[in-house]
From Swiss-Prot:
Repeat found in the keyword field: yes
Keywords: Cuticle, Repeat
Protein name: Cuticle protein 63
Sequence repeat residues: 27-30, 33-37, 39-42, 84-87, 90-93, 96-99, 102-105, 135-138
Domain of life of the native organism: Eukaryota
Keyword Secreted attributed: no
Protein species of origin: Locusta migratoria
Function according to Swiss-Prot or TrEMBL: Component of the cuticle of migratory locust which contains more than 100 different structural proteins.
One annotated GO molecular function: structural constituent of cuticle
Amino acid sequence: GLLGLGYGGYSGYGGYGGYGHGLALAAAPAAIAAPAVVAAPAIAHAPAVAVAPAVAHAPAAVSTVSQVSYGTTHYAPAVAKVAAAPVAVAAPAIAAAPAIAAAPAVGLGYGQGLSLGYGHGLGYGHGLSLGYAAAAPALSLGYGGYGHGLSLGYGHH
């Protein structure tokens, strides 16, 4: 399983732990397979962030989580295992066209706006979002939009 704790993040993103400026602690396999990309219904007014920066300052088993969205296609996150040392992964935030979740059990985030779990669950970025991912049994609880708030996730992958 993957246990993630993060500060900030795409709330409502089922099972992949903290997002944005945050930290993901892995008690899980070194690599997690990304779900297959499938079509999803169109949802307007949901600008996506291309790459979510992850900053890790944690003990040995640390996974950094990145999420990439282009246009209306949402790619599942890549999870990479890193060594026990302060690690900083900084990528520029790129404004994208309105985008929606396109992978099973993947959430849609709009910074401080809407957060929608494509598997099961619905939330609001500035409030509380709770989602259950159908593709990989996972529970995600998050508060806040991109860059502030708290998100917590647990999943079996």
